[in-house]
Amino acid sequence: MMNTKTFTSVNRVIYDDNYSLKQQQKSSFINQFLKGLLSAITLLFFILLLIFAENTLFGLGFGDENKSMMISKSLNAFFDLHSPKYLQLNFLIVFRFFILSFTLFYTLIKNFTNLYWHRATIKKYLPWFVLYLVIATISFLLFFTFFSVWPKEVFNLVFLLLVLFLLNLSYEIFNYFISKKTNPLLYDNYKNLIIAMVFQALLLLFVIITPLVWINTGKSPNFLFVDNRFYTRIVDIFTVQSGKNFIILIAFFFFLITFIVLANTNFFALVINKRYDRNYVKNNLWFILLLFSAIFIWLLRVFAYKHENENLPVGNNHLLWVYILQSFFAIIILILYMVFTLKKRLSVKSSLNTLLNLVVTQTILSLSLFLVTLFNSKSVVSLINVFITITVQMSVFGIYIFQNKNISTKLLVLLKVIMILIILTAAIVGFDYLLTSDHHNNYLFSNIQPKMNLVQIMLLLNFSLNFTLISYLTIKFAMVIFKINKLNKELNNEKK
């Protein structure tokens, strides 16, 4: 009888283990499928938005001028703030862009993040996956279909944020009860959830009420900058020097920053409890790779924009061809890095050495690109150099991350910041080339600073970040060598 019970118990344990293993494998398959589907949709969304950027992101629309947010089918007046008419049109374009972009990016990133957190409970997360994807798709489609120039209609886009908040609220409640079972120590306290949701609601309320007040305090809801008391009051606060206005500004920014911090209480709680580990950051890098892939494909399209005065000379301007050598230099650096890295793999290597090699390579690339762009005035040359160099930089990052499995979380976060900066630089160069094309003739990014344009500022920032990192590593490397030498001297003295 005892043997029969023991045999039954053993069978039960084996069955439970097999069932659990099958469930994990099934959840892993579903998770990988959803991640692949989301990746394909994300890449498609970004590629289409960028290829049709002048029509979608800048609001030119499709078809005749009646379906455009600009007066003419050109971006020549984009960010022209010299008249109330252009000021209002540009404000509405920027407002539309920020609302739709925020909703699109937030929902896509949220889905990628949640797929990581719910690897074991993926089936239960499926409804939220679909709903977040639906909101992302709506935002994407509105970029292609919504081109209203009426303030009230454009301001109605904020209600997308209300829908997003309600979805977030339902997800956070679901996540709290699910995570409470798997990680009771971290999710035992529901106060963080309540604080985050309350302050998110207050921020949303501010975003919704502000446009409503704006359009209802003027003589006409169709005019935002003419005979509008709200606009006049805002201008006075920022321009009229008085103690009252100073206190209002300080109080506004203080409460805004406080509300933003408290609205992200859950995030800070996870950071403090070290839930954002190396694997989580690597998961984020996948989204960055998708974004870079879209930028890479789009830049190939950007080369097609006509610049009659920017054609490359055929043998009559040797200096320009010297500038283009930056691209060949970047490729040579990549080859040398790959050869050196492969050679090092055959011998024992330290993580500090490999990191130093990475940072030196990135610093050389960012410095050479900045210097060439600083002295070169041809947009097409800058576009070629940036296109090649950033591709090399991202390739170097990819090689380093692929070959080093035990990168610290802090370093991964820093590399992530540098990658985002590289992508932003590439996007700005692409948009600058689009705006300065013959059809649009807009030099917005070139007129921000008298001595340096926005592209050069971004490249300088990229170099500065790499230079700061290499300075830190050089000091750390010197300290390690000093400690080793000191230890060797002590050992030699003991032997004597």
Curated annotation (Swiss-Prot):
Which keywords has UniProt assigned to this entry? Cell membrane, Membrane, Transmembrane, Transmembrane helix
Q: Does the keyword Nucleotide-binding apply?
A: no
Record keyword Lyase present: no
Identify one Gene Ontology CC term for this UniProt entry.
plasma membrane
Q: Which domain of life is it from?
A: Bacteria
Q: Where in the cell is it found?
A: Cell membrane
Q: How does it sit in the membrane?
A: Multi-pass membrane protein
Which residue windows are transmembrane per the record?
33-53, 89-109, 127-147, 154-174, 193-213, 247-267, 285-305, 320-340, 355-375, 382-402, 411-431, 455-475
| UniProt-recorded name of the protein | Uncharacterized protein UU048
